[in-house]
């Protein structure tokens, strides 16, 4: 809804092509006056791509196990204890306090304190007594502490380096406000919660307050700010040359490494979210990204009494932009240290970072408008829509490739989600084409309008149709759902509406705005479509909520039907929640004779039989590996039951109901904004600046829905990241294919395999290997990849699931274990692997086993290893 046709009559002539007729003054900053622009908006988009591109690289490195969570801690320590303190120290030393606008700092402090205490009080009133104080301590910190240095500073530098370079120094002054004045209050609440949980009567009130203040003083950022201010006066704002080069070397490494580390910390944070967590996250993110920016801006407008009107306006805009910065990773560190509200805080950090990018982009565009002239506004919305459509289309292509390659599009509700993604893709393509259609090409405009608005109305309707299908899935389990009717409705009704609009509507010839191409009739049609979709989606989700027990939504990583962890979304966690092995793979076996695989065409094949759902014994059995070693060494995927069940597991996967519910909730928010825009235009003749902001939000939502879909469905590592990693390794190292492991392996892999065979292999076999049926009357000793990962962590051979996967992959490369069909590398999933027979040439090294680990083995032998959720 990019319409400004309701502005005063003298400004209604927007028929000209904005890209050709706008003057230069409008093109640069959209400033109709002769004043210079307050910020360099042309550098914003590249800065956002730079920052979030590095974050994405870090995420891919963590998801692909190039850097494990344990290894990432070293990078985090370097960033927080060396790079950032050096950067802070130098900038505090050279800071010119005479140029600081202290009223700006007071305004930010009041705004942050207001949000902090509002969130704190509401949490104390609403939260359950069991965890009231921990929530009241961490949630306000979440809502007020921004990622000032890693994400904020590069963006401020891009916007204000050429116009107001002194604004960069405010980052170093504003950041300690939260750390020194507000965070101690939150820490004290957390210490009170810890005291209540432990019932430690000896811990008095003074000690609790002291511990809270001590945590603040231990923060390197706070410590270095005080040291830097002291040396500011001692050195007279001049850093010695021999020290300056050293500080520059550390400080210059901060930005890239901090953003990369941020991506690493985002891996697997969205996990096992319950229904109640959705509400909490939405409220916290709203407080951080919407309430705080507005309060910061209003406080500066109210308290700043600067002489320059331009500087006053620019400061208030800067305050708003500062408030939009996402949550700092340090909040997640605080939650982990206290072991309180970790899931909500870490998940919120990821979501706020993801959501803040489009908000910062739109906010910066809005802040460049000194007047309400409709021409530059319409031009800006056209360009924002075009830019977002390009990136969104790429995200949608990625997400659709995930659904196609995983074959989830064949099952519900992913079949309907695929239609939604296709409609969103057509919307982006239509917007891109609309941008190039000439004003006088009426036929071209009509054709593109039909393409654009048929698909846009389809995205509106698919939100409601997807919600009602989720309700039917939840209500009727696997009962047949009228998929054909839903698909026909999702595409047919929008096409019918656009057809009626073409026949009955009157073309508004003086507008190039697609949202007002057919004037009032189009706005009414859009409003009715939005209202119906919101009504259907809202009723469906409420009914779905009533039919489900409180908190019974499955986690992001758990399947409702199989209780299997969904591939690609489990965190590197030290103590994951227990998940049972799929029922597909468990039962008793009446006969456990050696597999009677026969040799044919150079390959071993198990006898062809009808599929049997249950294949393994309920108790671990020590198989005769020398006897059936060749069993399933090259099982045919069309005849072996284990291979068939693997394929069924990989294809069926998870219905991902929680992800679809979250998708519907986020889309409903955008539908409400569009409906508000339509109603505002129909009933209000004086739109004002808030209406303009709403128009920008609607444009970003309509053509940026791909970001939401990508964030929810586009991050499957096994279909995109790992294949790319394997291909890159193949090209880099010129390796053989996975089936040919005859090439020499590295000495490190040899040593790992020899140590495992000599000290750990037999115990591992006794603990995790089970007899599983692979033929009519045959069985083989196999184990699941996730079971080996759990065992490696249990005995201390790996510190986390990421390192365990690397260890298992070394065993595969060294020929110690092998996938039953040799199709997959080692994965932390319910895929079947087997131990290969010991090679005579493999002599164990002379290494003394650790006594403590041997004692640990004795304990493990008397107890079965716990079942952990796989890291996939």
UniProtKB/Swiss-Prot annotation:
Domain of life: Eukaryota
PROSITE patterns in the record: DEP
Lumenal face of the membrane: 1-40, 103-106, 157-169, 237-245, 297-317, 370-383, 438-440, 504-522, 684-693
Any one GO molecular function term: cholesterol binding
Membrane topology of this protein: Multi-pass membrane protein
Domain DEP: 759-837
UniProt main location, coarse: membrane
Residue span of region PIN-like transporter: 3-372
Gene3D superfamilies to which the protein is assigned, alphabetical: Rhodopsin 7-helix transmembrane proteins, Winged helix-like DNA-binding domain superfamily/Winged helix DNA-binding domain
GO biological-process terms attached to the record: cellular response to amino acid starvation; cellular response to cholesterol; intracellular signal transduction; negative regulation of BMP signaling pathway; positive regulation of TORC1 signaling; transmembrane transport
Keyword Membrane: yes
Family annotation (Pfam families): DEP, Mem_trans
Renumbered residue ranges of the record's region GPCR: 382-719
Side Cytoplasmic, residues: 62-81, 128-135, 191-215, 267-275, 339-348, 405-416, 462-482, 544-662, 715-872
Gene Ontology cellular-component annotations: lysosomal membrane
Keywords, comma-separated and alphabetical: Glycoprotein, Lipid-binding, Lysosome, Membrane, Transmembrane, Transmembrane helix
Glycosylation-annotated residues: 11, 17, 31, 311, 383
Parts of the chain that traverse the membrane: 41-61, 82-102, 107-127, 136-156, 170-190, 216-236, 246-266, 276-296, 318-338, 349-369, 384-404, 417-437, 441-461, 483-503, 523-543, 663-683, 694-714
Role this protein plays: Cholesterol-binding protein that acts as a regulator of mTORC1 signaling pathway. Acts as a sensor of cholesterol to signal cholesterol sufficiency to mTORC1: in presence of cholesterol, binds cholesterol, leading to disruption of the interaction between the GATOR1 and KICSTOR complexes and promotion of mTORC1 signaling. Upon cholesterol starvation, GPR155/LYCHOS is unable to perturb the association between GATOR1 and KICSTOR, leading to mTORC1 signaling inhibition. Binds indole-3-acetic acid and may play a role in tryptophan metabolism.
The protein's name in its UniProt record: Lysosomal cholesterol signaling protein
Species per Swiss-Prot/TrEMBL record: Pongo abelii (Sumatran orangutan)
């Amino acid at each position: 809804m990019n319409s400004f046709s309701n502005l005063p009559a003298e400004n209604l002539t927007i028929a000209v092509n904005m890209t050709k007729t706008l003057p230069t003054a409008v093109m640069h900053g959209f400033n109709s006056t002769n004043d210079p622009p307050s910020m360099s908006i042309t550098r914003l988009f590249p800065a956002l791509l730079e920052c979030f591109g590095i974050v994405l690289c870090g995420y891919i490195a963590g998801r692909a196990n190039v850097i494990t969570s344990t290894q990432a801690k070293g990078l985090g320590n370097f960033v927080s204890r060396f790079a950032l303190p050096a950067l802070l120290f130098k900038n505090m030393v050279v800071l010119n306090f005479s140029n600081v606008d202290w009223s700006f700092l007071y305004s930010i402090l009041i705004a942050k304190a207001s949000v902090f205490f509002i969130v704190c009080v509401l949490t104390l009133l609403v939260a359950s007594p069991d965890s009231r104080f921990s929530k009241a301590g961490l949630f306000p910190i979440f809502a007020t502490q921004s990622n000032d240095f890693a994400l904020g500073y590069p963006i401020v530098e891009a916007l204000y380096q050429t116009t107001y370079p002194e604004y960069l120094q405010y980052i170093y002054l504003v950041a300690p406000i939260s750390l020194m004045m507000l965070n101690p209050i939150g820490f004290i609440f957390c210490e009170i919660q810890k005291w209540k949980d432990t019932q430690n009567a000896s811990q008095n009130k003074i000690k609790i307050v002291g511990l809270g203040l001590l945590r603040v003083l231990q923060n390197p950022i706070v410590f270095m700010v005080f040291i830097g201010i002291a040396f500011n006066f001692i050195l007279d704002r001049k850093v010695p040359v021999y020290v300056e080069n050293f500080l520059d070397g550390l400080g210059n490494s901060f930005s890239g490494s901090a953003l990369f580390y941020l991506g690493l910390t985002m891996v697997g944070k969205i996990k096992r979210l319950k229904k109640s967590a959705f509400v909490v996250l939405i409220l916290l993110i709203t407080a951080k990204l919407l309430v705080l920016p507005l309060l910061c801006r209003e406080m500066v407008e109210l308290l700043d009494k600067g002489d320059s009107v331009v500087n006053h306006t620019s400061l208030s805009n800067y305050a708003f932009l500062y408030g939009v910065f996402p949550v700092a990773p340090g909040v997640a560190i605080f939650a982990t240290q206290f072991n309180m509200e970790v899931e909500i805080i870490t998940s919120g950090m990821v979501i706020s970072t993801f959501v803040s990018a489009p908000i910062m982009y739109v906010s910066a565009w809005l802040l460049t408008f000194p007047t309400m002239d409709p021409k530059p506004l319409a031009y800006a919305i056209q360009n924002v829509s075009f830019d977002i459509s390009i990136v969104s289309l790429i995200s949608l292509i990625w997400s659709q490739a995930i659904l196609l390659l995983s074959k989830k599009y064949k099952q519900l509700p992913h079949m309907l989600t695929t239609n939604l993604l296709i409609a969103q893709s057509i919307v982006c393509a239509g917007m891109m084409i609309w941008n190039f259609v000439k004003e006088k090409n009426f036929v071209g405009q009509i054709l593109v309008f039909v393409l654009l608005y048929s698909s846009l109305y389809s995205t509106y309707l698919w939100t409601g149709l997807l919600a009602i299908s989720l309700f039917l899935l939840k209500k009727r389990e696997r009962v047949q759902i009228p998929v054909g009717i839903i698909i026909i409705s999702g595409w047919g009704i929008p096409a019918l509406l656009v057809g009626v609009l073409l026949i009955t509507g009157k073309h508004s010839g003086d507008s190039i705005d697609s949202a007002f191409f057919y004037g009032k009739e189009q706005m009414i049609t859009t409003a009715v479509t939005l209202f119906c979709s919101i009504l259907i989606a809202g009723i469906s989700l409420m009914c779905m909520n009533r039919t489900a027990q409180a908190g019974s939504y499955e986690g992001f990583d758990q399947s409702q039907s199989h209780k299997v962890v969904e591939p690609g979304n489990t965190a590197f966690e030290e103590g994951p929640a227990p998940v049972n092995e799929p029922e597909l793979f468990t039962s008793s076996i009446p006969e456990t004779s050696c597999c009677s695989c026969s040799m044919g065409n150079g390959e071993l094949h198990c006898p062809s039989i009808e599929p049997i759902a249950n294949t393994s014994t309920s108790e671990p059995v020590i198989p005769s590996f020398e006897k059936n070693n060749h069993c399933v060494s090259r099982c045919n995927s069309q005849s072996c039951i284990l291979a068939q069940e693997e394929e069924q597991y990989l294809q069926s996967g998870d219905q991902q109901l929680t992800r679809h519910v979250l998708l519907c909730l986020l889309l409903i928010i955008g539908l409400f904004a569009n409906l508000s825009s339509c109603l505002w235009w129909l009933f209000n003749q004086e739109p004002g600046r808030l209406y303009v902001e709403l128009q920008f939000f609607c444009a970003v939502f309509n053509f940026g829905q791909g970001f939401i879909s990508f964030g929810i469905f586009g991050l499957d590592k096994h279909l995109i990241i790992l294949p790319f990693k394997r291909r890159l390794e193949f090209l880099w190292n010129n390796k053989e294919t996975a089936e040919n492991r005859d090439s020499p392996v590295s000495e490190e892999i040899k040593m790992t395999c020899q140590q495992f065979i000599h000290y750990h292999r037999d115990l591992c076999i006794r603990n995790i290997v089970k007899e599983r049926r692979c033929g009519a009357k045959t069985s083989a000793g196999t184990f699941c990849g996730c079971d080996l990962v759990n065992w490696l962590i249990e005995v201390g051979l790996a510190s986390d699931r990421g390192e365990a996967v690397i260890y298992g992959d070394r065993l595969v490369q060294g020929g110690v274990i092998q996938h039953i069909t040799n199709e997959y590398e080692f994965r932390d999933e319910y895929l079947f692997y087997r131990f290969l027979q010991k090679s005579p040439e493999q002599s164990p090294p002379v290494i003394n086993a650790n006594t403590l680990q041997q004692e640990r083995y004795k304990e493990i032998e008397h107890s079965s290893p716990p079942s952990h959720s796989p890291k996939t």
